[in-house]
């Protein structure tokens, strides 16, 4: 019955002269998401895309629900510009939609069609009412709306509206380097970055043998979930054990976390340059832990000259957890394997670290050599999406 999927996008249509670039990127991402399914035509019109269906509606919709830039989708039945054919198609859509009340809402961009929109509403409403059992018309609070669009090439009839993730197509705003731990926050930050059009490279700091291989596998699994929204994702694993040992042996305990984060940012700056990523993303939320106070963030930021994006900076933990559950990262994040950020944490870390004292403490470290050693031993992985979303 359904011949195509009507895909709507919102913010993209406001992009003026740049709109074709955004639309082309969206279509490319849609084709990537549908790879492996039968080939199909996609037809772009203003503010929407029609995707051809081959009796595979649910599979197509499930994949496109992970494509940023899509606001919503509707399976569409088509009919020629003949009233009787439109009536029959509308009845089929009505019977396929659950509920006991309905209303018809017609649009008529094709002004050559002999009936006006109100007349189409009346004709179809009367027909549906007499050809369906147990149905009532309710123009104020119907269980479903039967939408009818009368266009030059034919009529499109639909009722079901499937939500999309919204946002911008991945890749239109550049690349960002995501600092990803095994926790709840950073994968959500990555998701939010992708929603604003960023393509991601992920950087994970691994402290073997203090953190196990299972900790690393957890991060790979988190990246696999994120890759379901973007396509294959590059994961850079940085060995961090020697740096943490040096900090523990040579620096005041109250500054462990601050100096550790500054070392991470130095390494991230170098990796970002190699990845051509002009921004760093973190999962920090203001005031959540000692390293996430304004003063700590300011001191940590001093070692990089790139923007540090913190998509979750004003979020409550409950809000972060809600999104983590929805996107499929929460159950992975709570696996009981420590990451390097939970190791060597002092009982009383400084929440307002003075920059001068932190810099003085770092003079006890061979900062350049430690960073260089880490960069020489990076492991680079390509993480594919989960099997059930490709």
Curated annotation (Swiss-Prot):
Keywords: ATP-binding, Cytoplasm, Nucleotide-binding, RNA-binding, Thiamine biosynthesis, Transferase, tRNA-binding. It comes from the Bacteria. It catalyses: [ThiI sulfur-carrier protein]-S-sulfanyl-L-cysteine + a uridine in tRNA + 2 reduced [2Fe-2S]-[ferredoxin] + ATP + H(+) = [ThiI sulfur-carrier protein]-L-cysteine + a 4-thiouridine in tRNA + 2 oxidized [2Fe-2S]-[ferredoxin] + AMP + diphosphate; [ThiS sulfur-carrier protein]-C-terminal Gly-Gly-AMP + S-sulfanyl-L-cysteinyl-[cysteine desulfurase] + AH2 = [ThiS sulfur-carrier protein]-C-terminal-Gly-aminoethanethioate + L-cysteinyl-[cysteine desulfurase] + A + AMP + 2 H(+). ATP binds at residues 179-180, 204-205, 261, 283, 292. GO terms for molecular function: ATP binding; CCA tRNA nucleotidyltransferase activity; tRNA binding; tRNA-uracil-4 sulfurtransferase activity. PANTHER family: TRNA SULFURTRANSFERASE. Catalyzes the ATP-dependent transfer of a sulfur to tRNA to produce 4-thiouridine in position 8 of tRNAs, which functions as a near-UV photosensor. Also catalyzes the transfer of sulfur to the sulfur carrier protein ThiS, forming ThiS-thiocarboxylate. This is a step in the synthesis of thiazole, in the thiamine biosynthesis pathway. The sulfur is donated as persulfide by IscS. This is Probable tRNA sulfurtransferase.
